[in-house]
Amino acid sequence: MLRRLAPLLAEFNFVPLVSKVSHKETKYRLLTKDYVSVVQPGAGLPEMLRVDPAALTLLSSTAFDDVEHLLRSSHLMSLRKIFDDPEASDNDKFVALQLLKNANISSARLLPGCQDTGTAIIAGYRGDQVFVPGNDEEALSRGVYDIFQKRNFRYSQNVPLSMYDEKNTGTNLPAQIDLYASKGMEYSFMFVAKGGGSANKSFLLQETKSVLNPKSLRNFLKEKLAMFGTSACPPYHVAVVIGGTSAEMTMKVLKYASCHYYDDLITKPDMKTGYTFRDLELEEEVLKVCQNIGMGAQFGGKYYAHDVRVIRMPRHGASCPIGIGVSCSADRQALGKINKDGVWLEELEMEPSQYLPDLKEDELLKTPAVMVNLNRPMPEVLQELSKHPVRTRLSLTGTIIVARDSAHARMREMLEAGKPLPQYMKEHPVYYAGPAKQPDGLPSGSFGPTTAGRMDPFVDLFQSHGGSMVMLAKGNRSKQVTKACHKYGGFYLGSIGGPAAVLAQNAIKKVECLDMKDLGMEAVWRIEVENFPAFIVVDDKGNDFFEQL
């Protein structure tokens, strides 16, 4: 006779999904001792930290002022190390030099480091002994509003008027604010300015148990990491999260990891302190994969990534979510905290010039740039470009039209309605970009390129109507663009993604709004440039630089 076995019951053992990280190496600067006080509520209750909402507004405003203009010293050191690596390509070093120059310019707080000053993202952890009268989110949002009004930033947030119609808010609000409960008498924060380029390179991949073995996982990551391409402005800080109790948890940890928030995480699973851990060995392997992809720091080489963070999490037995993402060369985040001693913000590097190498561009570039005069008929410009192979470095001078997503969509509507493509799209090169605000006394605000790939669906249509014959932007493009350029005799020129302040200060001489002013920063602009740097990426013969890597 069979006996029924009693089920084995595991003892209750609470283990946090992600163990607490200390950030003990982070250095902070004191903003103020105002707005905080310790109060005794009585009735046997513990003392409380009272935080005036003005403290949240000050911290938020100062944090975004800093991250838009300054970088962490660790990021700058990673750029500087490229010059000491004999395996780094000349292209790697050239891009790194531009990014360091850009950091030096933006540290003056007149031009932000990137024209896409991003979505304001705030994560806050409020201790149970912290009391804030009023609305925390409102106070933090006020700080975002204040600094975006004050500084030469860009308003990038669109709100829906209907399912299909939308408008720019003109404030960069709403911000994304996630607030959590924690223990203690401290309110801690992470502030992130996340641009569209790197945000769009966050991928959730729903896999299965079959990928959880060394060979399969390595092959999987080798294939998927190339999906980033160069449009999010490498060198990257790459993050990989394997597992997760839900899709949203995987992606949240991914974003935090790309910001180095979990650098202090345990490196082995611990049944008492935490299951989620960093795999340092796999991080080194994945970094080598990135170095061998060939894209390098945008135009070929080793430095596709500065570093890699790989985090393993618990998962449901039927699911294996994997998240991969990046923080780009505009690596913009800072920690903050409010405690009984005052309001504190992470120290970012205010003297980036110390990381500049004693090196001139001419020492890196073996051949001089081809000078291209854009102020002549388009057929002549195309004839000049056709003389040179992909990879050729150019120096552009003349008139360029600036148009991006919304302007392209409106022009397509014009064509669909039987109207002609605007003449300026036929007579001049088109630069995919959207400027930050123009500082007083300067011809341009920060004005770097946006991701070219988003405009790929428009290229064949526009070129068939004689427009977009020369395109200028950042990143690699799809085969449909290569085919269109081959068919119609067009070109795609790549610009370095990241050094938006350098371009504004050195290459852009005049900016004026030409058309579609109601689109805000996505309006059509006319700019005059002088020695604007670019590379031939796709030519009129069916060649694509990135396909040759």
Swiss-Prot record:
One of its GO terms (cellular component) is mitochondrion. The keyword Thylakoid does not apply. It is an enzyme of class 4 (lyase). Its EC number is 4.2.1.2. Binds 1 [4Fe-4S] cluster per subunit. It is found in: Mitochondrion. The keyword Mitochondrion applies. It holds the Pfam family Fumerase_C. (S)-malate 1 binds at residues 115-116, 154, 197, 404, 450-454, 474. Disulfide bonds: none annotated. InterPro entries: Class-I_Fumarase/Tartrate_DH, Fe-S_hydro-lyase_TtdA-typ_cat, Fe-S_hydro-lyase_TtdB-typ_cat, Fe-S_hydroAse_TtdB_cat_sf, Fe_dep_fumarate_hydratase, Fumarate_lyase_CS. [4Fe-4S] cluster binds at residues 114, 233, 328. Pathway: Carbohydrate metabolism; tricarboxylic acid cycle; (S)-malate from fumarate: step 1/1. Keywords: 4Fe-4S, Iron, Iron-sulfur, Lyase, Metal-binding, Mitochondrion, Transit peptide, Tricarboxylic acid cycle. Specifically and competitively inhibited by 2-thiomalate, which coordinates with the catalytic [4Fe-4S] cluster. GO terms for molecular function: 4 iron, 4 sulfur cluster binding; fumarate hydratase activity; metal ion binding; protein homodimerization activity. Homodimer. Catalyzes the reversible hydration of fumarate to (S)-malate. Catalyzes the hydration of fumarate to L-malate in the tricarboxylic acid (TCA) cycle to facilitate a transition step in the production of energy in the form of NADH. Belongs to the class-I fumarase family. This is Fumarate hydratase 1, mitochondrial.
